[in-house]
């Protein structure tokens, strides 16, 4: 019972890793991407020779073997690498032991529904099979993943299939445009796909399935190192993206400071213009008061003129005196008229200047509003970049915890 629980824990831990990589729960992904990731991770959750179970929060998928007589270009590339690696091991052997590396006749394919009553010719999985297939446990395959020259020498990409587009290892987990099948609900005791319903689940020895023994220990340690290298690579990418976001945030902060300085300068200009407007309005108000006072004085003078003319008719004796007084009053009235004209001209000039200043004030207000909108947009963009940086930091912390967990697992395993 304890051995079965340990086996289930190993299988479920592998499934969780696949699900965390985001290859089984997103739409519009390449149907073969999960199989590629499984090959890279070493294929330790296989429970028979050609059957693999994948699971996530939406359900379970089964990967079954192809026809042994039909092999694609992808299969032939993997078989050639396995043969070359097997030949190298044969040349380097010292104790006469034969290598376990043999080319696999087929690769697993996806099926959109559970497959029942699968016929398995060899129910006992070989220890070298997971090491032989395209995975990070195979040095030749690891070199082909990260060395594009070797793939060009072979004539085509090892991931190129007739019905799919070519993918590079660096964008292995990026979105794809191919359709992906629906998931079958996962169940441990129902009629769907499950660990116990897979063929050959209990037929193989427990040591081979759990990775015990010399071959199993080697596969487990190599797989842990491969997974750690993969996560370290993702951490480096996350750190690079975080540094780029930080540089963008610094640039935006500089722009925000410049806009704030412009707003302060414009506000100072606005304050100066408002003070000038206030002064000119007071001046125009004083001019209007003076005009009214002069008009009152002019009216008084005209009344005196009328009285004087009436007195000329009545007082002939005082004609000379009244004429002289009349001349003086007329001169005074002319002075007042000249003053009124001067005040009218000044009023017109002041009114035009007031209109110009009001127009400039409206333009300055609109400029301030535009600068404030730009400031708000930059602040919003800054907050978005800060949120993205925090998300990237959280992802990097999670990956660092995953690396520490792998290190502790490796130490505990040793």
UniProtKB/Swiss-Prot annotation:
Residue ranges, compositional bias (Basic and acidic residues): 88-101
Coiled-coil residue spans: 243-405
Residue ranges, annotated region (Disordered): 87-117
Keywords, ordered alphabetically: Coiled coil
Protein name: Uncharacterized protein ECU09_1880
């Amino acid at each position: 019972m304890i051995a079965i629980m340990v086996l289930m824990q190993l299988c479920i831990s592998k499934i969780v890793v696949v699900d965390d990589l985001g290859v089984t729960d997103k739409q519009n992904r390449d149907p073969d991407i999960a199989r590629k990731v499984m090959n890279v991770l070493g294929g330790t959750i296989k429970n028979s020779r050609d059957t693999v179970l994948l699971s996530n929060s939406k359900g379970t998928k089964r990967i079954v073997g192809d026809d042994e007589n039909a092999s694609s270009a992808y299969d032939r590339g993997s078989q050639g690498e396995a043969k070359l690696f097997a030949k190298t091991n044969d040349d380097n052997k010292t104790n006469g032991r034969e290598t376990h590396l043999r080319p696999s006749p087929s690769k697993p394919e996806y099926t959109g529904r559970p497959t029942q009553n699968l016929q398995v010719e060899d129910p006992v999985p070989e220890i070298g099979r997971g090491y032989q297939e395209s995975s990070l446990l195979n040095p030749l395959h690891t070199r082909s993943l990260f060395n594009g020259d070797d793939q060009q020498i072979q004539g085509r990409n090892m991931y190129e299939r007739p019905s799919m587009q070519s993918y590079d290892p660096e964008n292995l987990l990026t979105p794809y445009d191919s359709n992906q099948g629906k998931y079958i609900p996962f169940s441990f005791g129902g009629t769907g796909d499950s660990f116990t319903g897979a063929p050959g689940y209990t037929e193989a020895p427990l040591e081979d399935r759990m990775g015990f023994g010399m071959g199993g220990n080697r596969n487990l340690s190599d797989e842990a190192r491969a997974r750690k290298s993969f996560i370290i690579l993702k951490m480096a990418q996350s750190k690079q993206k975080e540094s780029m976001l930080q540089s963008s945030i610094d640039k935006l902060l500089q722009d925000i400071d410049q806009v704030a300085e412009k707003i302060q300068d414009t506000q100072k200009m606005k304050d100066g213009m408002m003070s000038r407007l206030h002064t000119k309005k007071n001046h125009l108000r004083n001019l209007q008061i003076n005009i009214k006072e002069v008009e009152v004085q002019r009216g008084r003078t005209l009344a005196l003129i009328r009285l004087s003319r009436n007195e000329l008719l009545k007082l002939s004796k005082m004609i000379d005196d009244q004429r002289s007084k009349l001349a003086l009053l007329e001169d005074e009235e002319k002075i007042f008229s000249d003053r009124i004209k001067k005040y009218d001209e000044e009023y017109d000039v002041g009114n035009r200047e007031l209109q110009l200043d009001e127009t400039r004030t409206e333009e300055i207000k609109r400029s301030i509003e535009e600068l404030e909108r730009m400031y708000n947009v930059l602040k919003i963009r800054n907050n978005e970049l800060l949120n993205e940086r925090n998300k990237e930091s959280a992802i990097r912390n999670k990956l660092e915890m995953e690396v520490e967990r792998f290190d502790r697992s490796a130490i505990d395993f040793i």
